[in-house]
Regions:
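Surface positions of alpha-helical coiled-coils, especially the charged/polar e/g heptad sites
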Residues: 39, 46, 50, 57, ...
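N-terminal positive-inside, membrane-proximal cytosolic segments immediately preceding the first
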Residues: 1-21, 29, 33-35
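Soluble extracytoplasmic domains of inner/organellar membrane proteins
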Residues: 82-83, 89-196
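N-terminal alpha-helical signal peptides/signal-anchor transmembrane segments
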Residues: 50-76
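Transmembrane signal-anchor/signal-peptide helices with a preference for the extracytoplasmic
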Residues: 24-46
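Conserved non-transmembrane functional hotspots
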Residues: 66, 77-80, 84-88
């Protein structure tokens, strides 16, 4: 009798087990879909934030670039005057510092949102921030050189101003390269429809 009961109940039990299995698999698939959607939304927010940061950094560079070009020209005039033996007195040879941010990029990396970005976008943005890091290191070195220049200006003003001209010149060259990378990357992202 128990075998007969088992035979009758077996299809019901198998159907119930299949429905439970299907329900569990459906729930897991729905959870995976939701998590994937959340990750993609995070990556999209991170990308928009990074693009806004790059735009802001570009504006900062545009401002400081003009000022540093003017300062470089003024420093070259001062150097020419000093080399010609004319006293320039208290010549103002200075440097405008660009305050660039990488907070959005660092946040995108720490939140692991970059894992869900298109590989080419991630590579392009990595290049932007790599060059920005180089620029910031060169800028810090230029600030150090300018500080040293002020310290040694009384002993050898020609050498001090020459060092200032070199520092500003190197920074200005790298400045142009960084702006070009910013613009190219932004243009590419907009053209491909990744951002507005």
């Amino acid at each position: 009798m128990s075998t007969n009961l088992m035979r009758r109940k077996l299809p019901e039990l198998l159907l119930e087990a299949a429905m439970i299995f299907f329900a569990v698999m459906l729930a897991l698939a729905a959870e995976e879909w939701r998590e994937n959607r959340d990750r993609l939304e995070l990556a999209d927010r991170a990308l928009r934030s990074v693009v806004e940061e790059v735009r802001s950094n570009l504006e900062e560079l545009e401002t400081t670039g003009v000022r540093n070009a003017e300062r470089l020209e003024a420093a070259r005039v001062v150097l020419a005057e000093l080399e010609a033996g004319r006293d320039e007195g208290d010549a103002d040879v200075g440097l405008e510092v660009a305050l660039l941010s990488s907070a959005a990029w660092q946040s995108a990396q720490m939140s692991q949102a970059v894992q869900y970005l298109d590989f080419d976008i991630m590579r392009d943005l990595s290049e932007v921030y790599e060059i920005q890091d180089l620029y910031e290191r060169v800028q810090a070195g230029a600030v150090d050189n300018m500080t040293e220049m002020m310290r040694t200006a009384e002993q050898d003003p020609v050498a001090a101003v020459r060092q200032g001209v070199i520092s500003i010149s190197v920074l200005t060259d790298l400045h142009g390269s960084l702006m070009e990378v910013y613009r190219d990357t932004l243009e590419k992202l907009v053209a491909e429809g990744d951002v507005r």
